[in-house]
């Protein structure tokens, strides 16, 4: 067995990079239903994808700038306005393409990882 205790920060950084790459796909998928930032964070968390606000909100802005999400301000019950995000038609096309690509890559990696065992 390999002692990795001294390299744990490296593994944490690699895992963080891997998650960051998947977040675009996850956010687009979750925004099929209108979501505001915190509800999206909670929804992703329930599915095992933790994301902090410092990552989520810039990602939402970037996806909106790219035309993959739309947003609108809405007044919630007796509270401050919330910005709700929803996938756009262009975002739906991107999600379909990314989903196919994810499945292809996942199969390839499964084959590689199974080969190691």
What are these model-predicted stretches?
Residues 66-79, 86:
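Beta-hairpin "wing" of winged helix-turn-helix
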Residues 62:
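Alpha-helical DNA-recognition elements
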Residues 1-14:
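Short, intrinsically disordered or compositionally biased N-terminal tails of bacterial proteins
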Residues 93-117:
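Amphipathic alpha-helical dimerization/coiled-coil segments
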Residues 18, 73-78, 92-95:
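Short, structured secondary-structure boundary patches
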Residues 15-57, 74:
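N-terminal helix-turn-helix DNA-binding core of bacterial DNA-binding proteins
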Residues 81-99:
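Basic, amphipathic "hinge/linker" alpha-helix immediately C-terminal to the N-terminal HTH DNA-binding motif
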């Amino acid at each position: 067995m390999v002692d990795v205790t001294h390299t744990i920060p490296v593994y944490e950084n690699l895992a963080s990079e891997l998650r960051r790459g998947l977040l675009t796909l996850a956010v687009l998928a979750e925004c099929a239903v209108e979501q505001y930032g915190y509800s999206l964070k909670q929804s992703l968390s329930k599915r095992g994808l933790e994301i902090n606000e410092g990552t989520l909100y810039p990602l939402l802005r970037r996806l909106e700038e790219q035309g993959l999400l739309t947003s609108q301000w809405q007044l919630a019950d007796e509270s401050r306005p919330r910005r709700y995000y929803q996938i756009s038609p262009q975002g739906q096309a991107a999600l379909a393409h990314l989903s196919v690509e994810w499945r292809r890559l996942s199969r390839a990696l499964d084959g590689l990882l199974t080969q190691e065992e």
